[in-house]
Amino acid sequence: MDSNTTSSFQDILVRMSKMQLESSSGDLNGMITQFESLKLYRDLLGEAVMRMGDLHLLQSRNGKWREQLSQKFEEIRWLIEEVRHRLKNTESSFEQITFMQALQLLLEVEQEIRTFSFQLI
């Protein structure tokens, strides 16, 4: 796992948590939860690629891993759209920077997950 990506995730999550404290938006809490879930999934997939012998373990433990992968891509697309929507509607420069960084991070993570999944297939 790239240490820059890890620190980016942590930075985005901290920033979103601060924004959540300043607003009453429950939607932001959902985004934070999905970001955390996505980070864990990406990390697990990356570890499986690093230990290619785990591919068989991954497949036997979760026979529906392709469905799970598809679901994660749907979540990424939803998060990208949600971040874009919030970016268009915010006037706070702190929030704009946070959402721009979140969007960039989501695109990077989507590419990483695609790369990992192709290596596993």
Curated annotation (Swiss-Prot):
A biological process term (GO) from this entry: exit of virus from host cell nucleus through nuclear pore
Motif (Nuclear export signal): 12-21, 85-94
Keyword Transport: yes
Localization per record: Virion; Host nucleus
Primary subcellular site in the record, as a coarse category: virion
Keywords: Host nucleus, Host-virus interaction, Transport, Virion
Gene Ontology CC terms: host cell nucleus; virion component
Coiled-coil regions, chain positions: none
Domain of life: Viruses
Keyword Ribonucleoprotein: no
Transmembrane segments: none
Subunit structure: Interacts with protein M1. May interact with host nucleoporin RAB/HRB and exportin XPO1/CRM1.
Function: Mediates the nuclear export of encapsidated genomic RNAs (ribonucleoproteins, RNPs). Acts as an adapter between viral RNPs complexes and the nuclear export machinery of the cell. Possesses no intrinsic RNA-binding activity, but includes a C-terminal M1-binding domain. This domain is believed to allow recognition of RNPs bound to the protein M1.
Note in the entry: Average number present in a viral particle is estimated to be 130-200 molecules.
Family: Belongs to the influenza viruses NEP family.
HAMAP family: INFV_NEP
Protein name according to UniProt: Nuclear export protein
Organism annotation: Influenza A virus (strain A/Gull/Minnesota/945/1980 H13N6)
